[in-house]
Amino acid sequence: MATNGCLISLPPFFTTTKSISSYPFLSTQLKPISLSSSLPTLLSLNKRTTQFPTFVSVLSEDDNTLVLDDQEQGGDFPSFVGEAGETEEYQEPSEDAKLFVGNLPYDIDSEGLAQLFQQAGVVEIAEVIYNRETDRSRGFGFVTMSTVEEADKAVELYSQYDLNGRLLTVNKAAPRGSRPERAPRTFQPTYRIYVGNIPWDIDDARLEQVFSEHGKVVSARVVFDRESGRSRGFGFVTMSSEAEMSEAIANLDGQTLDGRTIRVNAAEERPRRNTY
């Protein structure tokens, strides 16, 4: 018994080459693009899969044909590389773009420091240094700008900048493993006060608060033991003028602070050691 049937010739679903005109989104002026031969593609022509290709392995410019790789996709998507296998990597800022920022107000955190220096350029890193024992700011930090030029601009803008009543010290941080060259010393009068017999729980911020009632405080520092991290019971305060220093000494020497009688007098400069 004969059976009825018809012969239909179906075109192959995929071909190894196709005219570039069928892909209007590709320009005939494109340069050849070569992916690494070790990287798999998304399509295997041998298996007649219905998955559409995502990556083009070779774009031929001579005959305007689009050639698909015949390897099967496996694993993660490949990463693109340029000519000669070059990859774009992040470059760390120069050490010359790192700044030391001293005499910071104690309520300024790293975020506030970064926001301040954004006026000079792009801030890569901003860090306020804290005491490990008390978790309080030590009054200084570091800022790394994006370029050396921006770092120079930041020094110009913020050196001796008045931030909440304190004059900032801003200069280039010394590169790791090297000692900064010391500038020639010039004599500048400092109105520094020694404060003794202070209570053990007094920190820099409280000491500054006490002396700020008698003038502008440039800096205030309680001396802590390096090993234990506890106060050694004395500190130093620098006022902005001789008159304010004299007023603070006259009003605070012999006064009681949290149950202890404090000693307040002009600090003596340490004698310089002779070098041979």
Swiss-Prot record:
Predominant cellular place of this UniProt entry's protein: plastid
Subcellular localization: Plastid, Chloroplast
Any Gene Ontology CC annotation: chloroplast thylakoid membrane
Domain (RRM) ranges: 97-175, 191-269
InterPro entries named among the record's database cross-references: Euk_RNA-bind_prot (IPR050502), Nucleotide-bd_a/b_plait_sf (IPR012677), RBD_domain_sf (IPR035979), RRM2_NsCP33-like (IPR048289), RRM_dom (IPR000504)
One Pfam short name: RRM_1
UniProt xrefs under SUPFAM superfamilies: RNA-binding domain, RBD
Transit peptide: 1-57
SMART domains with a match to the protein in the record: RRM
GO biological process, any: chloroplast rRNA processing
Keywords linked to the UniProt accession: Chloroplast, mRNA processing, Plastid, Repeat, Ribonucleoprotein, RNA-binding, Transit peptide
Molecular function GO labels: mRNA binding
Matching PANTHER family: 31 KDA RIBONUCLEOPROTEIN, CHLOROPLASTIC, OS02G0815200 PROTEIN
Known function: Probably involved in the 3'-end processing of chloroplast mRNA's.
Protein name, UniProt field: 28 kDa ribonucleoprotein, chloroplastic
Organism field: Nicotiana sylvestris (Wood tobacco)
